[in-house]
Every structure is written in C-alpha cells, then in structure tokens.
C-alpha cells in the first residue's frame, strides 16, 4: 500500500501510518509537470479506468494521446485501455439503483469482468471501496480523483482557473462530452469538473 498525504490533520493519525509508505499529493497530481512522471510506469500495462467521463477518456486516448503532452512519458502507450462509466449519484439525478451500495456492487461486478493490470479511479466516494475490492482481487488500483480527467486531456473550469495546470492545456484538450455530463452538472462544486 502507498498512502497519499495531503492535509495537516493527518498528523493526528500518524501513529497509525508510520509503518506505511507514503507520498505527498502533489507527486500524484503533478504528473504532467514532472520530467519522469509516475504515469510512465503504466506503459505496456492493461489499464482499466473507472470514471464518469468514460467515453471522452476513450476518445481522447484513441485519437489524441500523442498530442496532449509535450513529454511523451506523461501518457504512455498502454497494452490496452478499458473503461467503466462510474455511477454519478449527484445533483439529484436518478441512477437506476435503489441505494448507493447497489451502485457500488454493480461497479464491483463490472470490474470483476475485466482483464487488467492496474485500475485508475476517479469516481468520488466510490473510489476507496472500489480500490479495496481491486486489492482483494490481487490487482493494483490508483485513486487519482478529479485529476484523472487531466491525464486524458479533459479540461474543465477547475484547471482553466489554476495557474499550475493552465500552461499544459493545449488545443487538443476537450471538455467532457455531453454524454458524460449529468443533468444539473453545474450544481456540483460550482461545475468545477465540467
């Protein structure tokens, strides 16, 4: 296990984590600005992405992966890319499941059907339980959160207003496709993902 440290409040729990390996969140999130990013370790691997923007991610990887970043190590050639469209139980939208746990179980069952080496997760509150499920399968998972969309050249309000990200956005970046955008999307965190 590798823990990502982010907040000062983690000091209160440090005695529980002192035997674990950890990195700071900036190491995980700033892959696009590093000379040798951690994402290069995905080269040649079978990658599964669980994210609400599955269709946009597939399109960007298939059509523009070599144009998104000047550093080709940021988004390397995978052996394969598969996606699962994460359930978005947000903004009052119906999701087709009676409970949050039913949606989680459905995503677990979809993951069980896939052949992959590493899963990249950007699926909100579902990510940690899914990562635990993937670990129990004997596979690896990386919970990237919101920055996962940036790896595939998908921009949004959050990145266009952030001076750290702005220099890396080029003409090949896109907004999430309409098929990947829920109704009332802009009611969620001020529309920062869209």
Where are these regions (language model features)?
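Electropositive, gly/pro-rich neighborhoods at or near active sites that engage anionic ligands
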Residues: 1-77
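Glycine-rich phosphate-binding "P-loop"
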Residues: 16-24, 82-106
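A general structural motif
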Residues: 44, 115-116
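Hydrophobic/aromatic beta-strand patches that form the interior of the parallel beta-sheet core
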Residues: 48, 82-84, 120, 142
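Gly/Ser/Thr-rich loops at beta-strand to alpha-helix junctions
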Residues: 52-56, 120-129, 145-149
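A short, acidic, amphipathic alpha-helical segment used as a generic capping/interface helix at domain edges
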Residues: 102-115, 126-128
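C-terminal functional extensions of proteins
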Residues: 129-194
């Amino acid at each position: 296990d590798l823990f990502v440290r982010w907040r000062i409040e983690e000091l209160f729990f440090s005695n529980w984590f002192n035997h674990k390996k950890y990195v700071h969140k900036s190491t995980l999130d700033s892959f696009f600005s590093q000379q040798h990013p951690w994402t290069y370790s995905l080269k040649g691997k079978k990658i599964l992405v669980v994210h609400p923007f599955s269709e946009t991610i597939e399109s960007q990887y298939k059509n523009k992966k070599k144009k998104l970043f000047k550093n080709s190590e940021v988004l390397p050639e995978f052996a394969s890319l598969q996606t699962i469209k994460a359930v978005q139980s947000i903004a009052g939208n119906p999701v087709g499941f009676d409970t949050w746990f039913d949606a989680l179980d459905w995503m677990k069952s979809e993951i069980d059907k896939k052949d992959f080496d590493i899963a990249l997760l950007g699926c909100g509150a579902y990510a940690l339980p899914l990562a635990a499920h993937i670990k129990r399968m004997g596979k690896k998972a990386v919970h990237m959160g919101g920055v996962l969309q940036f790896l595939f050249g998908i921009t949004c309000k959050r990145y266009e207003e952030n001076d750290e990200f702005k220099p890396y956005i080029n003409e090949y970046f896109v907004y999430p496709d309409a098929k990947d955008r829920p109704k009332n999307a802009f009611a969620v965190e001020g529309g920062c993902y869209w």
